[in-house]
Amino acid sequence: MRLHDLYPFPEERKTRKRVGRGSGSGLGCTSGKGNKGQNARAGGGVRPGFEGGQMPLQRRLPKRGFKNMFAVKYEVINLARLLAAFEGKAEITLDDIYDRGLCSLGSAVKILGEGDVTTAIKVEAHKFSASAVEKIRNAGGEAKALEG
């Protein structure tokens, strides 16, 4: 038996729905659309969200707030994860973080303070939490915040 000889069993293949082909097929006559009415007609049916003339939910609810298109979205990395990825390294740059795959390329990075710093390290990122800066400085290291 070769790869081109493989085929699914006939009962495993789902047959398409053939409508309007006689009453013996189970989908003859009205073709599964029921009797008369808007949904039985060609091109029939109502648009999404239509509630039969009642004021739709989308219009009943008030508009609120807005999305700030200039908001900066930071990808967060905890100190524990950062130190595990760069064990024994004294200086961690933003390019190192991107190369190691800790966050997606070009994204803004924020370092959070979960984990313990035992050695002096120099870390480069866009933002740091207060606890992360404190832990890095207490270990004799430096937290360098970048612009952008």
UniProtKB/Swiss-Prot annotation:
GO cellular component: cytosolic large ribosomal subunit
Tagged with keyword Translocase: no
Region of interest (Disordered), ranges: 1-57
Coiled-coil region(s): none
Subunit structure: Part of the 50S ribosomal subunit.
Function as written in the Swiss-Prot or TrEMBL entry: Binds to the 23S rRNA.
Name of the molecule in the record: Large ribosomal subunit protein uL15
